Amino acid sequence: MKGLIGQKLGMTRLFDKDGVSIPVTMIEITPHRVTQIKNIENDGYCAVQVTTGMKNFKHINRPETGHMIKSGVDAGRGVWEFRCEEAGMPQLSLGDIITIQIFKNVKKVDITGISKGKGFAGTIKRWNFHMQDASHGNSLSHRAPGSIGQNQTPGRVFKGKKMAGQLGNYKVTVQNLDVVNVDVKLNLLLVKGAVPGTIGGNLSIKKSVKINIREKM
């Protein structure tokens, strides 16, 4: 398995043996239950589908209920899947349990989550634009973005132009976070630094795919 789903509990700090404070995020990773094994013959790709947490069957729809009953597992708070290479497909069966133990010897992880939504924001907050003059004849345009185009040619606003709009509530991945501690008894993963999302939000935690060149040297 390349990764698991965790729930953000919040941030705290730890002290190393030299007394240096390390900011860490606490992530709870409860045992996962395998709900489906996907393969190239039936699905066109290889993946392991899992669920975690608990949910009453009366709170999920009939197709989901049937899927869980067919897999022989209790309903969870959601369903996720992790793709695998055909050659490296783990030997798992429906109903198998996967725990935080898979991160025991992992040093770095990539974490994906939905960032905090901040609503409609202007260009200064959203894109770090410079403010216009506070005085010197300027009025009503202190936080305005300025020109968004050229002239009759090209006669349009280019796609991707940085303007005001929705800020936050994006899918964000933070790469190469250091694993500080893996507590198997409490199902807790402690990683150095901040991760996207609110407390209680779901996070996808995977083993890092990129290698830090300096550490490799």
From Swiss-Prot:
Q: Please name one Pfam family that this protein belongs to.
A: Ribosomal_L3
Post-translational modification, briefly? Answer: Methylated by PrmB.
Signal sequence span is none
Look up the domain of life of the source.
Bacteria
Oligomeric state and interaction partners are given as: Part of the 50S ribosomal subunit. Forms a cluster with proteins L14 and L19.
Question: What is the stated purpose of this protein?
Answer: One of the primary rRNA binding proteins, it binds directly near the 3'-end of the 23S rRNA, where it nucleates assembly of the 50S subunit.
- Name of this protein: Large ribosomal subunit protein uL3
Organism, scientific name = Blochmanniella pennsylvanica (strain BPEN)
